[in-house]
């Protein structure tokens, strides 16, 4: 148990059995009336963001979320199997928990898996990953380094937009949060 005065960004709260991450908070002391804490909370499971106000000093339940570095090993049916980098335990993670980051995961990808009561909550990848372009239309005469984009398929099967000069077989850096092309990878 903690009070609203102890809130910090990144904390996970258990409010009515639902887990929420504190994204932002502000202590407010108006000239008249009692102080309060205005928070922005993000639902851990759905990603929904809400604003919530608490009276200053009230008790809130802080959930224990264990963030572990794990290695993605393979698909087992629908589940993704991760191995804990410290204990070498293997944990199956359902596709709903992995979410959109599955588009950027290859075998042996290092990821952070958040666990609450030994149940996986979400999977986070680094901000960018390096992947190979498996298919894209060839560039044509006159393509420049600036200008338009074209669709390309990554080795994971995900589709992204890349500049016209990128060819099949090139390694590119991709933002895992929104799937944007960030640049070529030079060896």
Curated annotation (Swiss-Prot):
Top-rank taxon, per record: Bacteria
Pathway(s) annotated for this protein in UniProt: Protein biosynthesis; polypeptide chain elongation
Broad class of the protein's primary localization: cytoplasm
Keywords associated with the record: Cytoplasm, Elongation factor, Protein biosynthesis
GO biological process, one term: peptide biosynthetic process
InterPro entries: Elong-fact-P_C (IPR015365), NA-bd_OB-fold (IPR012340), Rib_uL2_dom2 (IPR014722), Transl_elong_fac_P/YeiP (IPR020599), Transl_elong_KOW-like (IPR013185), Transl_elong_P/YeiP_cen (IPR001059), Transl_elong_P/YeiP_CS (IPR013852), Transl_elongation_fac_P (IPR011768)
GO cellular component: cytoplasm
Cellular compartment(s): Cytoplasm
Coiled-coil spans in chain: none
PROSITE patterns on file: EFP (PS01275)
GO molecular function per UniProt: translation elongation factor activity
Family: Belongs to the elongation factor P family.
Function description: Involved in peptide bond synthesis. Stimulates efficient translation and peptide-bond synthesis on native or reconstituted 70S ribosomes in vitro. Probably functions indirectly by altering the affinity of the ribosome for aminoacyl-tRNA, thus increasing their reactivity as acceptors for peptidyl transferase.
Protein name: Elongation factor P
Taxonomic source organism: Parafrankia sp. (strain EAN1pec)
GN (gene name): efp
